Amino acid sequence: MQTKERIDYIKNWICDYCKSMPKEPDSLVIGISGGIDSSVTSAICALTEKKVIVLSMPIKQLKEQHKLSLQHQEWLKSKFKNVQSHLINLDEVFKSFEVSLSAFSNEHGFANSRARLRMTTLYQVAAANNGIVVGTGNKVEDFGVGFYTKYGDGGVDISPIADCKKSQIWQMGKELKILQNIIKAQPTDGLWDDGRDDASQLGMSYQELELAMEDKNSENYKKYLEIRKRNLHKMKPVPVCKMKNE
């Protein structure tokens, strides 16, 4: 599938899904991080001509990450009249959360809590606007290595780009003319004070992960399987205790 065709296909899929719902939503609600995935997803959503609400939700965010988020919001609004943007600073809410749970302090847990707080915010905004929450995860993250927060950025209503590889996301970004500084930025989940990028957390770049997913003979295939095994619980349905003979 060519890049433009892929964009149109995703756009039409979003429209068809909304029409298939018992009550068609009035809006599409998306969290904007300043990264390529959320930038591409929000731009494709805007192409549907439905009302699109994009949220920037900084929590102890690095200035450069937050700047990219705001720049994309402005770019999006300059291109599409159906886009609304909001800055919802969650710093104080998160600080209160950290204080309340100081007896249970855990760095990794608090990092994931940032994503879960953003998810809660997205759903509140969606509820107030008869909207649905649109996910921004790609195929490598969502179905390859499970690189997302359980019930955080993984908690969405639809996942339009979850069957697209990271390389395809970058191609769509270029086709959509997403800002160059976003296309060139190092991918990061934005959950850590030190601004660590995705590659440093995964131990591989997205290009290496894609190759490992597609080629069992690649040098990183074993490492890919190890990461996948660790995170498989995120990608599987919640285990249910089935009663015998019932």
Language model segments and positions:
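Extended, folded domain segments that form the structural surfaces/walls around functional sites
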Residues: 38, 57-60
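Short, surface-exposed alpha-helical segments at coil->helix boundaries
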Residues: 38, 42, 66-70
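Phosphate-binding/switch loop-helix module in NTP-utilizing enzymes
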Residues: 118-122
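ATP/NTP-dependent adenylation/nucleotidyl-transfer catalytic domains that generate, transfer
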Residues: 2-30, 43-53, 60-61, 72, ...
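Conserved G/P- and acidic residue-centered "switch" motifs that form tight phosphate/ATP-binding loops
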Residues: 35
